[in-house]
């Protein structure tokens, strides 16, 4: 058995070494894109960083991978990807793009990443993450839509009138939120670690998904005036509310709250419960 494990480990290391060797040494290339864009689509595990110190798009990749890098503008969309049926062969794919105040939509897939210290600002901001992609940025808008799947992660504060969060497949979001309306839909073991203040909170949690417990100054960190919605499949939520809570819980789900909210009209079945806590 030990011999088999040794052989397997050797083969894995050889394969990784071969991939890195095939990718070649890192090289950098500039891409000039004419015209503005409002949408960014990134695929194939590119790591994108926004900078105000550059005026062209700069890509770093293995010298044998670089010919397969595609940076193109289609209409209002900037798309960064590899050519179809090609591979990075173990090469890190890094991109630096100039700061663009007009950017209002970010779409990441295939374990891609987006990093910006400047924030997205507009009337409506859309963020779509799939395939274990990661987003690091603050968002300011009238309306914000975040759609995440496949163990993707979002790290950043959101300030908007309306926020719609839809997470599935063990995705995670973490940040400070300020909104008039916050709609949270979590499924498939997804988690939201949120702090902040919202007027209207709607929760739809299923499949062991959670609004994670976070305590600030002897209360739960996510504050709302009113909360309604459904929770099922062993999901948990922790909120602070001084207004009203009207929820339907099933399948061993639990809603924990601090504050003086009235829970009249709520319904709990299947071992579910609403708990008034004092952290």
PLM regions and their residue ranges:
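Calcium-binding motifs, dominated by EF-hand helix-loop-helix domains
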Residues: 106, 127, 146, 165, ...
């Amino acid at each position: 058995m030990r011999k088999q494990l040794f052989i397997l480990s050797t083969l894995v290391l050889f394969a990784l070494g071969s991939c890195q060797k095939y990718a070649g040494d890192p090289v950098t290339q500039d891409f000039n894109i004419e015209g503005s864009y409002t949408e960014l689509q990134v695929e194939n595990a590119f790591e994108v960083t926004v900078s105000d110190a550059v005026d062209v798009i700069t890509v770093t990749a293995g010298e044998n991978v670089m010919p397969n890098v595609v940076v193109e503008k289609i209409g209002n969309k900037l798309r960064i990807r590899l050519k179809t049926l090609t591979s990075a062969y173990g090469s890190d794919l890094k991109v630096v793009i100039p700061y663009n105040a007009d950017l209002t939509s970010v779409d990441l897939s295939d374990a891609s990443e987006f990093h910006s210290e400047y924030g997205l600002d507009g009337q409506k901001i859309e963020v779509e993450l799939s395939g274990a992609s990661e987003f690091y940025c603050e968002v300011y808008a009238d309306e914000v839509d975040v759609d995440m799947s496949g163990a993707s992660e979002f790290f950043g504060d959101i300030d908007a009138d309306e926020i719609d969060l839809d997470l599935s497949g063990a995705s995670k979001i973490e940040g400070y939120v300020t909104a008039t309306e916050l709609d949270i839909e979590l499924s498939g073991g997804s988690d939201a670690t949120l702090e902040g203040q919202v007027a209207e909170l709607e929760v739809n949690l299923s499949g062991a998904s959670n609004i994670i417990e976070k305590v600030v100054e002897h209360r739960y960190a996510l504050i709302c005036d009113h909360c309604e919605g459904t929770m099922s499949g062993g999901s948990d939520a922790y909120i602070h509310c001084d207004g009203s809570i009207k929820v339907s819980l099933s399948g061993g789900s639990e809603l924990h709250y601090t504050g003086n909210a009235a829970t009249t009209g709520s319904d709990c079945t299947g071992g579910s419960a609403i708990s008034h806590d004092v952290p």
